[in-house]
């Protein structure tokens, strides 16, 4: 009898332990995710909408689109005293919110910490390249807006008060890290993706971002030298002495990497017969598909029901979902 009870108790405890260690049913577990190419693609696809600049062409406070209700502009009641003007939201740290402020950065660093779950090295490194590109883009945007910024290349735990309260890093150090991330992206990204080559970051996109970021920082330091924005024009980080000249040289070298790889659309190269002297200019606005030879990183804007990412406004306007009565 005692033996039977001992056996039953062992079985019961074993079953309870197995139940308690089950993976979460309503949330992603890093141990079971980030294992396949589709997992990595799904996670990194969010970076495009979170970090790239928003270029929606319709505006509910203009004449080209209306929301579900008449707004203050359309009613003629929007005035300075009514305080109905849109202002950017500010989080508790005083940073203007942009899709959750540091949330996109956390998602990038979280991805880089767990992408090693994918055993296919070629796939893993390709999507790591996407993450490095967008971390560089994220910090490039933040430095443009705020100057000095705290640099994080890891996920901050809720109890890590030291990291949460760390002071800002000098903009020169952060921009140096931006260029390093561009180099990491360039090493890992393909020349072009098999599917949607125009709309995925590539080697050319990484070098274009590096050239843009380095040119911005180099000219900023050149024309603000000696001001509180640039206390000293030469700084040394990780053994590198940086200055306005250093950033400008980095911009030149990055630009040289992609020069000659793209060509401007000259017309009549996609099976479309020119109908006028300025046909190429006309086709720039009427072609359904862009010429890939002149595009480094683009977006597709089509009124196609199958296309919903970043094209919802066009979809809504085509189908009459955006109007004064709908």
Task: Indicate residue ranges for each PLM-predicted region.
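Conserved, well-structured interaction surfaces
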Residues: 37, 41-55, 75-146, 161-198
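Bacterial N-terminal signal peptides that target proteins for export
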Residues: 1-3
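Short glycine/serine- and small hydrophobic-enriched flexible loop segments
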Residues: 113, 140-144, 209-219
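An aromatic- and glycine-enriched ligand-binding surface/loop that stacks and positions planar moieties
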Residues: 17-79, 149, 200-204, 212-326
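Short, well-structured active-site flanking segments
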Residues: 143-154, 222
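Short, conserved phosphate-binding/catalytic loop or strand-edge motifs used
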Residues: 152-159, 230-231
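C-terminal motif of bacterial Sec signal peptides marking the signal peptidase cleavage site
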Residues: 13-15
